[in-house]
Every structure is written in C-alpha cells, then in structure tokens.
C-alpha cells in the first residue's frame, strides 16, 4: 500500500473513530483535553493562540478559547485561502461565517490578522496521530505549509485517544508537531 493509500485509510478510520464517540464520551473527553492544555506552561505563557473551530467530530476547544479570552490572551482561528494558505484571524463580535468545507470561519474584513511569527501556541486538529507527534490531517496540507512559518510557537496536536495509530502515514513534507494532547474520557 502506498503512503497516499495509507493516509486515506488512516484518515477514514480516524474520522470514523471520533464520530463514533458517544455524546457523553465526547463531552468528557473535550473537557479533559481543554483542562490538560490549560495546565500546560506553553498555554500559561502564551499571549497569541491559534485554535480551530471544531468540525466533523474534531476535538472541541471552545472551552479553551473562552478561558484564553478570560485570561486576556488572544485566540485566533485559521482561515483557509487560495493556494492552500492559512491566515490567523482574531474575529470581531460579528466576524464569523461558514467558510470553506462548511467550517465556521472568521470573516477577514472583520478580523485582526496575526502573522505566523506572532503566535505563541498553535493547536492543530488531525484525523490520526502517533506517539512520535506525527499527524494525518484532512489531506490538503494547509497546516503543513503554515506551521514552518510559526517560528516561535509551540505546535500541539489535539485529538481523541481513539484516533491514535501505531505509525502515522507521513511524507517528507508533513510537519511533525512538538506534542499531542489527548482527550480521554474519565469517570
């Protein structure tokens, strides 16, 4: 099986695994994930944080965004652009729309834009990941092109335990992350 075929299989399995979580498991796992990230030094020290609006069963970082704003941090969100580019945008109160791929996205004209080198922490979704911080995304390479430009940021993946694989199928151009935080339901 080629790397492309392996990625497709891992992507499909990871999406199915996260969608298979019950509402209770998802709620508990999201809460645990956000609490773990909030306890990290990189979160405590960060001023500008790139989050994402959860889509298709992704780990939901909404509680983290609320807490970041409460602490005076600046939560930004990715906006997909031409040429598979990303822009980090801090939306205003009426600055949201449904963007590419049906994802809730900031409206650039109503948002403050942060340069990649202004970000202190970047939280990245995935469909599958492994123990050595490699990830399989949705397949367009947006984050793989963006992350190298985030020169001072800690880059963390956010996912559910059910999305873990033994070895993520990656190519040379796939960006390795600094770590992963995993949502695990607990009793």
Residue spans of the language-model regions?
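Short glycine-rich anion-binding loops that position phosphate/pyrophosphate groups of nucleotides
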Residues: 55-57, 127-131
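A residue-level signal for conserved active-site and pocket-lining positions in enzyme catalytic cores
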Residues: 14, 51, 75, 123, ...
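N-terminal active-site beta-alpha-beta segment that forms phosphate/nucleotide-binding
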Residues: 2-118
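Charged helix-capping and loop-helix junction motifs
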Residues: 66, 138-142
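Internal, well-ordered alpha-helical segments in soluble enzyme and binding-protein domains
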Residues: 10, 33, 142-143, 176
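Surface-exposed, charge/polar-rich loops and edge strands
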Residues: 1-5, 16-19, 107-108, 117-122, ...
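Conserved beta-strand segments that form the floor/walls of ligand-binding pockets within enzyme
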Residues: 50, 102, 122, 128, ...
